[in-house]
């Protein structure tokens, strides 16, 4: 991650642009890691992106995006598997990188809980594998699902049954029990698997995590059965009765039921003991025989876990304390520039292969032209101002067994005549001008849909899970059909049945296709001629428009006709349509500009009109409000709350549909005043606003 300008020095416009860039980068990283099992940046880079995103959101809360990465978990689902809705969400973890961040996490827990005595924690290795949820009913394994996006996963039940240390029957378990853990592959088994792959002339796996993920997600369970997968249990989801009263007792119960649990799990009393266990696990890391990338700390008392609850994508009661990165020196042999869906030009370092932490790596991210030149996007020096040139000896690091980043340059070993790298000002794919807008850290191709790279990437986005989700038409099929000229824009997908069902060129005659698979695809395409408005808006692939934003836009405009008309009439920066767009909660000037600009570009407009001609777009659903006595009301808490912390009260109110404000105004509906309430209570009385005490609040919401 490049050195960035301090968050407290950003202007509001710079912060908005930075949040947009971070959202795009994090979404791309999530898709590469969770969906394709082919990560493109290191764990450390990914963590840095999320940390900076969170820091900017905290500094500029009014700029928080409706599709904020802080609210997202995992990635899109792989093709070919049935979908499973998780009864209890599978969330990710907050990360810490040093003792200070661990202590801050503990202090936040204490503040949230209010009056609490000594806290106990468990510490366990963070396994670097693929998360899996196992559902047992009456002691029998009935379903296994990957995490997916946290809400919906992939059904891999038959594959999971082939894992040797995963029990298919339990004796003495609750009638319903979801056991969660990590599928992984040992170093020894990974080496043997790659040996067999090499002998058979097949592709080698980059690391054990990719091997485990790829093996579990095989469409043929026989292939999974031939792979030496293992499973550690460490958590649970839905259950008909509690496993125990504490985390460590629950883990012991899982072990008694026949699951493999990690023997390095320990009970700790505070930050010093947690740090000592972190150091001990890191000391043993090289000899464990499997990959870990940190230590997970959890509040031990399950009653406190329930009180602490969850944020949008992480539990408050757990955190992952990550290990430091691993370093190596190698030579930079070349720089390639790739073009993404939104036209971003991304430089990739081609390295002389080097082993870093036991994995051979040959590529690294170079982020953007500023990073190569030795400065951040604001012009401040990084790496002491040292630029990166082809032929340089560079220090690379990896954290999490993925493609590394370039951390430093050895000027003493720079070859004579090595020239400064000139970043292209035209697109390497289509030759269009590549421009860099103010506040943006990347250069982008202006070719739009005439750019081949953007065409194919946007087509992949169009058929993705949250967009049109056309069964049988995934990224690989899109690439092949695009390469042969069968599809160039989304509308072409809906022409496939007419063009390639009969005649000389038939889909069923293509490699990898047959009559049945072709007819199945044609049927899936026909089924998608009717589409929900929010899916269509998201599928257009307009920069900055994520799933949540698409839903907000659909809800606001109601119909495709209204949305299209508004975008067509809108002018950037002025007019009633522009003001109406900005009035949507979560839509800022950057996002609005992107939307309006897209609908005014000739090629984009033509593609949208061609697509719409094939579709029946369903109007947005009007969601029923949350049924509670405080739904839709603006609530203010003031004074000391004695039965719950302020944070706990806020979370409960918001869960019931209320909006919690920090100040009293004429728009306030209700003030909850505890002992010591001062000016806010007086202001509420002056305005005639209903005011109740904490007991009254608890009675109102039914928690008394």
Swiss-Prot record:
E.C. no: 6.5.1.2
Binding annotation for NAD(+): 43-47, 92-93, 124, 147, 182, 298, 322
Presence of the UniProt keyword Isomerase in the record: no
Cofactor(s) demanded: Mg(2+); Mn(2+)
Stored CDD domains: BRCT_DNA_ligase_like (cd17748), LIGANc (cd00114)
One MF term in the entry's GO annotations: metal ion binding
Active site, per annotation: 126 (n6-amp-lysine intermediate)
Keywords: DNA damage, DNA repair, DNA replication, Ligase, Magnesium, Manganese, Metal-binding, NAD, Zinc
One GO location term (cellular component): cytosol
Binding site for Zn(2+): 427, 430, 445, 451
Enzyme class: ligase
Catalyzed reaction equations: NAD(+) + (deoxyribonucleotide)n-3'-hydroxyl + 5'-phospho-(deoxyribonucleotide)m = (deoxyribonucleotide)n+m + AMP + beta-nicotinamide D-nucleotide
GO biological process, one term: DNA repair
Pfam families cross-referenced by the UniProt entry: BRCT, DNA_ligase_aden, DNA_ligase_OB, DNA_ligase_ZBD, HHH_2
Taxonomy, superkingdom: Bacteria
Physiological role: DNA ligase that catalyzes the formation of phosphodiester linkages between 5'-phosphoryl and 3'-hydroxyl groups in double-stranded DNA using NAD as a coenzyme and as the energy source for the reaction. It is essential for DNA replication and repair of damaged DNA.
Alphabetical list of PANTHER family matching this protein: CHROMOSOME TRANSMISSION FIDELITY FACTOR 18 (PTHR23389), DNA LIGASE (PTHR23389:SF9)
Annotated protein name in UniProt: DNA ligase
Species of origin: Cereibacter sphaeroides (strain KD131 / KCTC 12085)
GN (gene name): ligA
């Amino acid at each position: 991650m490049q050195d960035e300008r301090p968050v407290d020095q950003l202007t509001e416009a710079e912060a908005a642009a930075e949040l947009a860039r971070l959202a795009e980068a994090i979404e791309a990283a999530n898709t590469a890691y969770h969906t394709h099992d082919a990560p493109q940046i290191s764990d450390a880079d990914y963590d840095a992106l999320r940390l900076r995103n969170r820091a900017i959101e905290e500094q500029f809360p009014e700029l928080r995006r409706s599709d904020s990465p802080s609210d997202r978990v995992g990635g899109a689902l792989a093709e070919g598997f049935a979908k499973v809705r998780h009864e209890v969400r599978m969330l990710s973890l907050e990360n810490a990188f040093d003792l200070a961040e661990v202590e801050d996490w503990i202090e936040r827990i204490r503040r949230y809980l209010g009056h609490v005595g000594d806290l106990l924690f468990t510490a366990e290795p963070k396994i670097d594998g693929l998360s899996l949820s196992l559902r047992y009913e009456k002691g029998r394994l009935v379903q296994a699902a990957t995490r997916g996006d946290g809400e919906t996963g992939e059904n891999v039940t038959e594959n999971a049954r082939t894992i040797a240390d995963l029990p298919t029957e339990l004796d003495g378990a609750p009638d319903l029990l979801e056991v969660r853990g990590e599928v992984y592959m040992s170093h020894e088994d990974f080496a043997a698997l790659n040996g067999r792959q090499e002998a058979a002339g097949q592709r080698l796996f980059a690391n054990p995590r990719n091997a485990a993920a790829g093996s579990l997600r095989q469409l043929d369970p026989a292939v999974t059965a031939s792979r030496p997968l293992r499973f550690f249990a460490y958590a649970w989801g839905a259950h008909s009765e509690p496993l125990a009263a504490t985390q460590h007792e629950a883990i012991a119960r899982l072990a008694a039921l026949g699951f493999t649990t990690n023997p390095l799990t320990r009970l700790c009393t505070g930050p010093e003991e947690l740090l000592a266990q972190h150091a001990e696990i890191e000391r043993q890391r090289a000899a464990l025989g499997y990959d870990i990338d940190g230590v997970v700390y959890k509040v031990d008392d399950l009653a406190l876990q329930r009180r602490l609850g969850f944020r949008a994508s992480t539990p408050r009661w757990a955190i992952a304390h990550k290990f430091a990165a691993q370093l190596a020196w190698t030579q930079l042999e070349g720089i390639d520039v790739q073009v993404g869906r939104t036209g971003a030009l991304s430089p990739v370092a081609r390295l002389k292969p080097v082993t870093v932490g036991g994995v051979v790596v040959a590529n690294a991210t170079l982020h953007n032209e500023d990073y190569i030149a030795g400065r951040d996007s604001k012009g401040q020096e990084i790496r002491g101002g040292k630029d990166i040139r082809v032929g340089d000896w560079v220090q690379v690091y990896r954290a999490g067994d993925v493609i590394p980043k370039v951390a430093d340059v050895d000027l003493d070993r720079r070859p004579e005549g090595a020239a400064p790298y000139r970043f292209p000002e035209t697109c390497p794919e289509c030759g269009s001008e590549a421009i860099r807008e103010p506040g943006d850290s990347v250069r982008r191709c202006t070719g739009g849909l005439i750019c081949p790279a953007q065409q194919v990437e946007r087509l992949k986005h169009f058929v993705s899970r949250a967009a049109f989700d056309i069964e049988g038409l995934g990224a690989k099929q899109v690439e092949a059909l695009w390469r042969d000229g069968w599809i160039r824009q989304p509308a072409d997908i809906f022409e496939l049945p007419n063009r390639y069902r009969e005649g000389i060129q038939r889909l069923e005659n293509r490699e990898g296709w047959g009559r049945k698979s072709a007819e199945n695809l044609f049927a899936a395409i026909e089924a998608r001629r009717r589409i929900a408005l929010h899916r269509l808006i998201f599928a257009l692939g307009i920069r900055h428009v994520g799933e949540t934003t698409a839903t907000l836009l659909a809800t606001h405009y109601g119909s495709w006709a209204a949305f299209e008309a508004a975008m067509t009439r809108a002018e950037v920066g002025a007019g009633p349509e522009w003001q109406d767009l900005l009035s949507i909660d979560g839509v800022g000037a950057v996002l609005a500009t992107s939307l309006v600009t897209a609908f005014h570009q000739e090629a984009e407009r033509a593609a949208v009109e061609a697509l719409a001609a094939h579709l029946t777009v369903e109007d947005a659903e009007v969601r029923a409000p949350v049924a509670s006595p405080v739904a839709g009301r603006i609530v203010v808490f003031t004074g000391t709350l004695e039965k719950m912390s302020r944070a706990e009260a806020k979370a409960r109110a918001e869960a019931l549909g209320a909006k919690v404000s920090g100040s009293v105004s004429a728009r306030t509906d209700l003030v909850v005043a505890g002992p010591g309430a001062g000016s806010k209570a007086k202001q509420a009385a002056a305005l005639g606003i209903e005011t109740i005490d904490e007991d009254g609040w608890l009675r109102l919401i039914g928690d008394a």
